[in-house]
UniProtKB/Swiss-Prot annotation:
Start and end residues of each stretch annotated as Disordered: 73-143, 156-352
Entry protein name: Cuticle collagen dpy-17
Highest classification ranks of the organism: Eukaryota, Metazoa, Ecdysozoa, Nematoda, Chromadorea
One Pfam family in the UniProt entry: Col_cuticle_N
Database matches in InterPro entries: Col_cuticle_N (IPR002486), Collagen (IPR008160)
Polar residues bias locations: 337-352
Region (Furin-like endopeptidase recognition region): 61-64
Keywords, alphabetical: Collagen, Disulfide bond, Repeat, Secreted, Signal
A single GO molecular function term of this UniProt record: structural constituent of cuticle
Species annotation: Caenorhabditis elegans
Length: 352
C-alpha cells in the first residue's frame, strides 16, 4: 500500500510540474499584452494632453492679442490712465510701481517683483481678465477660478526640432514712459530696458521614437555574505490530534499487595443515559405454537353459480309395497280360490 501511495504521489507531482511549465508561456503572453495595451493608452493620453495644452496656449494668445498687446513686452493703445499723460506708465520688472493699459490708475495695483527675463502680469482691456506672464488668462475679480499656475508635472522627453517659423509683423511703437522715482541705495540690478523680454518656452513637442537599447553594463561585484539569521520564536502549540489506535497489550505485571479493607458503599444511581442506536436484526426465531381460533369474519359475497354436477349413482332398492286390493273379475274364467295366508310372490294360496 505504501509503495502504491509513493508512486501515485510521484505521478501527481510530475503532472503538476508539466502543467506549471505549460502555463508559464500563457501567463507571460497575457502580461505582455496588458503591458502593450497600457503603453498604447498612455501614449494616446499623452498626445491628448499635449493637444489640450497647445489649445490652451492658443486661446491665451488670442485673448492677449484681443486686449491690444502685440507681445509680452509691448504696450497697448488703450486709454490713458488718469495718473499721467496719454499712454500707460512704466511697468518694468524691478522698476517703480506703474499702471498698464486699461488700468484706472488706482493705488491698489500689485507690486511686481524684480525678476529678470519674466514679463510682468498685465491686465487686459477694461472689463477683461488679467493675463499671466506665460500668456494664459488668470482669474479676474468677478471670476471664480482657483487655478494653480505652477506645473508640478515632470517634463517629458524633448520633441523633434520644428521648422523655423516666419518673421512676425513689427510691433506698434511704444509710448515713452514716465521717469520713475529715485530708489533707495541697494545693489545694482540688471534690467532689460532694450529689446524684448525672454519669451517662455513653447509647448512640449511630441515624443520621439524609442531609442535603441544601450550596451550591456559591466557585471557588478559579488555581494557580501548576509548575516546568519536568528532562530525564530517557538510556534504556538498545535491542535490536539485524533485518538490513536490502541497499543499492543503489555506484559502482565507482578501481583500487587492486597488492598486495605473498606466498607462497601453503594453510590447513588447515575443519570439515565441516552438510548443507544438500534442493534442489528437478529436471526429468525422458531415457529411458535398455534394460536387460538379467531373470531369468524363476516360472510363473504355469494360466488358465481357452479357448473352442473355429474349424475349420482342409483339408489338402493326400496322396501316392498303393501298388498293391493283384489282386482276386478276378468269374466272369462272363474277366479281360483286363494289361501289368505299364502304369499303372492310364491304362487301359493290358490287351489287348483
Amino acid at each position: 500500500m505504501s509503495v502504491f501511495a509513493g508512486y501515485a504521489a510521484c505521478t501527481l507531482g510530475a503532472v503538476s510540474m508539466l502543467l506549471c511549465v505549460s502555463l508559464v508561456p500563457q501567463v507571460y503572453q497575457q502580461v505582455s499584452m496588458l503591458r502593450d495595451e497600457l503603453t498604447t493608452e498612455m501614449e494616446a493620453w499623452r498626445l491628448e494632453s499635449d493637444q489640450i495644452y497647445m489649445d490652451m496656449q492658443k486661446f491665451g494668445r488670442v485673448r492677449r492679442q484681443a486686449g491690444g498687446y502685440g507681445g509680452y513686452g509691448g504696450y497697448g493703445s488703450g486709454p490713458s490712465g488718469p495718473s499721467g499723460p496719454s499712454g500707460p506708465h512704466g511697468g518694468f520688472p524691478g522698476g517703480p510701481q506703474g499702471h498698464f493699459p486699461g488700468n484706472t490708475g488706482s493705488s491698489n495695483t500689485p507690486t511686481l517683483p524684480g525678476v529678470i527675463g519674466v514679463p510682468p502680469s498685465v491686465t487686459g482691456h477694461p472689463g477683461g481678465s488679467p493675463i499671466n506672464p506665460d500668456g494664459s488668462p488668470s482669474a479676474g475679480p468677478g471670476d471664480k477660478c482657483n487655478c494653480n499656475t505652477e506645473n508640478s508635472c515632470p517634463a517629458g522627453p524633448a520633441g523633434p526640432k520644428g521648422t523655423p517659423g516666419h518673421d512676425g509683423p513689427d510691433g506698434i511703437p511704444g509710448v515713452p514712459g514716465v521717469d520713475g522715482e529715485d530708489a533707495d541705495d541697494a545693489k545694482a540690478q540688471t534690467q532689460q530696458y532694450d529689446g524684448c523680454f525672454t519669451c517662455p518656452a513653447g509647448p512640449q513637442g511630441p515624443p520621439g521614437s524609442q531609442g535603441k537599447p544601450g550596451a550591456r553594463g559591466m557585471r557588478g561585484a559579488r555581494g557580501q555574505a548576509a548575516m546568519p539569521g536568528r532562530d525564530g520564536s517557538p510556534g504556538m502549540p498545535g491542535s490536539l490530534g485524533p485518538i490513536g489506535p490502541p497499543g499492543a497489550a503489555g506484559e502482565e505485571g507482578p501481583t500487587g499487595e492486597p488492598g486495605a479493607d473498606v466498607e462497601h458503599q453503594i453510590g447513588l444511581p447515575g443519570a439515565k443515559g441516552t438510548p443507544g442506536a438500534p442493534g442489528e436484526s437478529g436471526d429468525q426465531g422458531e415457529q411458535g405454537d398455534r394460536g387460538a381460533t379467531g373470531i369468524a369474519g363476516p360472510p363473504g359475497e355469494r360466488g358465481p353459480q357452479g357448473e352442473k354436477g355429474d349424475d349420482g349413482p342409483n339408489g338402493a332398492a326400496g322396501s316392498p309395497g303393501e298388498e293391493g286390493e283384489p282386482g276386478q273379475d276378468a269374466q272369462y274364467c272363474p277366479c281360483p280360490q286363494r289361501n289368505t295366508n299364502a304369499a303372492v310372490s310364491g304362487n301359493q294360496g290358490y287351489r287348483n
